[in-house]
Amino acid sequence: MVNRNASASAFGWDFQANAALVLMLDNIENAESIRVEGNEDIEIFLNDQRKIYAQAKSVMKADDYSNVNRNLIGALETLNDDSRKEDGDRFTYVTNSPNPFNNQTTMSYFYGNTHLLYDELPDVARRKIVDLITKNSFTKIDLEKFDVRIIPFIGEDLKNR
């Protein structure tokens, strides 16, 4: 039987909209406008004609790590495509998972509202990114412009969103 429950999709859209607001507010001094679910999940248009490209990937349960690898690969693929446009100021992977690299040893880096540049990520996370980039031929993404954002967003209680 086909599952027609749209709650996971609605949750993902809600997370994406909230992530867009957080990213926009973080860049308010340099931002002109924002587009959500246009060509990309999130695009922030900056005053200097450059853009912040962000891929928002959510999990409905904080302890569900079954899709984090697939989410990371999908985000890297799209951000790699965005890098070809040559107008990117930043390429952001934003998620609500406290375990975005599916590695228990790195979880302490990702609890709460977290923003880490590529160079600030734990070694095992950086190696995983490089391995995925190499394995999937994502050759355009500039890791000096790559960052990871964790935005807590779990459950039905709006205080947790």
Positions of predicted regions on the chain:
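Acidic metal-coordinating catalytic centers involved in nucleic-acid phosphodiester chemistry
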Residues: 1-7, 58-161
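Catalytic centers of nucleases
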Residues: 5, 9-78
